[in-house]
């Protein structure tokens, strides 16, 4: 069973072979005892899909505007080609509303202090593809010969609203017989089940996790998968410690309207500028819309959320277009559009590193500005007795690289493969023998990505002269080496 508000966990069900999906359907005991499920998950086998929020189709996207067109939601994710390939393989991607997703093939990143920049484009992927395939010919039978084209169509990533992906996964899972979707239902508690001798049970549940649901319903799980977020009750129940820290920052998100109306077939770019207070990113959505992710101090995040729409728009333009000293001044004094225009007229935008094709932000969708705290957390292990952690319950990462959901989807794929292997061998899916391979596969990989992202954030948050000089020099070196940029793009694309 899966209790799920987390897309990656729902995805794990589809990654199982059909014969094993059927094998995972649960049987219920007498009503006085807990219902027994092979797999239960917070945040997709009998399969109970439990979510505290409604998963009905209308929640797929944002509210409608005055003309009846549905606005884009402010919570979007950047899906790598590897993640999209996985979603296609499990049959979920075909349910995604394609008119509301946007692939991008390039990305420009620049230093807000020095103006040094890196321009990632499809040509860089082609250069590294040539190097990789040449090496593959020198090492017959190795994975080096794998073509870049096998991973995707040249895109860096694809933007998709979280609600769009969630609805697609729910639509997919609802097509299977024996699946029970329990949305709008909150888990009230987790406890160990009763002993066979004391409760007249045919099965000893004393070491099984039992979920308490509204209406005195109880569910016992042979395996409980926790994908219930950074403050995971499943992780707490399993007494699995985690290490990490808060960044004392918030990620401000919003849906923006740009001055450029893009043709659906035109190539799109993402943009990211590293400011001393944190990175700000503009990621493309269809048409003239984009999603904003601005990592900044908690105080500034509160200030930004309090601004009227016109002043918020001016603040976003300033953060991309002005010197960092001017950005700081405008965010603490005035963000009037006329002040922005005057300061921009006095700024050498090319020396600033601003891309020549960078769009101007014309407005912000009403009600779309929000924020969330930024933190890094990593569980000491992903598994316990009849417990597996996945996604944010296992690891929380800074959003500057947009890898959070992608890591979670990779977790889901790995866990599903491990369960399929164990079930084919006749293993108890809640046993350490079945689960250990999942933790061994994912913990080190996730830890490496988290470490790199954390260090990149700290390097770009430093304002000391030697650090600024060193990172700027690094930018310029990488910008001049196409095959290095291509390698970075391949890594970021999964």
PLM segments and residue spans:
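N-terminal glycine-rich dinucleotide-binding loop that anchors FAD/FMN and/or NAD(P) in oxidoreductases
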Residues: 64-98
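N-terminal mitochondrial targeting presequence
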Residues: 1-33
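Conserved N-terminal helical subregion
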Residues: 99-238, 243-255
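C-terminal helical "tail/cap" subdomain of flavin- and related membrane-associated enzymes
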Residues: 417-494
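Glycine-rich FAD pyrophosphate-binding loop
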Residues: 36-75
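FAD-binding beta-loop-beta segment adjacent to the flavin cofactor pocket
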Residues: 371-389, 447-448, 458, 464-468
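Glycine-rich phosphate/pyrophosphate-binding beta-alpha loops
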Residues: 279, 372-379, 394-406, 444, ...
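Conserved FAD-binding catalytic core of PHBH/FMO-like flavoproteins
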Residues: 87, 210-218, 222-358, 366-369
């Amino acid at each position: 069973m899966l209790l799920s508000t987390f897309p990656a966990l729902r995805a794990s069900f589809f990654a199982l072979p059909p014969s094993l999906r059927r094998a995972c359907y649960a049987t219920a005991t007498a009503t006085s005892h807990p219902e027994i499920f092979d797999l239960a998950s917070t945040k997709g086998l009998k399969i109970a899909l439990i979510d505290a929020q409604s998963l009905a189709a209308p929640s797929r996207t944002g509210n409608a505007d005055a003309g009846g067109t549905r606005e884009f939601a402010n919570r979007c994710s950047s899906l790598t080609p590897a993640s999209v390939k996985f979603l296609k393989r499990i049959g979920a991607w075909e349910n995604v509303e394609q008119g509301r997703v946007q692939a991008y093939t390039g990305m420009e990143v620049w230093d807000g202090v020095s103006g040094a920049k890196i321009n990632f484009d499809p040509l860089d992927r082609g250069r590294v593809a040539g190097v990789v395939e040449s090496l593959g010919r020198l090492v017959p039978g190795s994975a080096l010969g794998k073509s870049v084209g096998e991973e995707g169509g040249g895109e860096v990533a694809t933007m998709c609203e979280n609600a769009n992906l969630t609805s697609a996964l729910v639509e997919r899972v609802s097509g299977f017989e024996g699946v029970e979707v329990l949305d709008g239902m909150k888990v009230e508690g987790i406890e160990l089940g009763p002993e066979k001798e004391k409760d007249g049970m045919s099965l000893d549940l004393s070491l099984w996790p039992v979920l308490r649901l509204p209406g005195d319903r109880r569910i016992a799980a042979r395996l409980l998968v926790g994908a219930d977020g950074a403050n995971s009750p499943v992780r707490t129940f399993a007494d699995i410690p985690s290490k990490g820290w808060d960044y004392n920052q918030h990620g401000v998100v919003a849906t923006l309207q740009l001055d450029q109306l893009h043709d659906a077939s035109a190539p799109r770019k993402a943009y990211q500028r590293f400011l001393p207070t944190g990175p700000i990113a503009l990621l493309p959505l269809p048409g003239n819309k984009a999603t904003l992710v601005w990592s900044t101090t908690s105080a500034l995040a509160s200030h930004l959320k309090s601004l009227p729409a016109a002043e918020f728009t001016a603040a976003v333009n300033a953060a991309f277009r002005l010197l960092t000293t001017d950005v700081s001044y405008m965010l603490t004094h005035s963000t009037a559009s006329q002040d922005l225009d005057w300061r921009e007229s006095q700024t050498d935008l090319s020396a600033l590193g601003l891309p020549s094709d960078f769009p101007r932000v014309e407005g912000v969708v009403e009600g779309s500005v929000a924020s969330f705290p930024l933190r890094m957390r990593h569980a000491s292990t992903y598994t316990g007795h009849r417990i597996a952690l996945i996604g944010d319950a296992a690891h929380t990462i800074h959003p500057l690289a947009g890898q959070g959901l992608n890591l979670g989807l990779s977790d889901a794929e790995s866990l599903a493969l491990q369960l399929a292997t164990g079930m084919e061998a006749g293993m108890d899916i809640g046993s350490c023998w079945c689960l250990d391979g999942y933790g061994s596969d994912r913990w080190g990989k996730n830890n490496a990505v988290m470490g790199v992202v954390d260090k990149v954030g700290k390097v770009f948050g430093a304002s000391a002269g030697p650090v600024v000089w060193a990172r700027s020099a690094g930018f310029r070196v990488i910008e001049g080496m196409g095959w290095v940029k291509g390698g970075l793009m391949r890594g970021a694309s999964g």
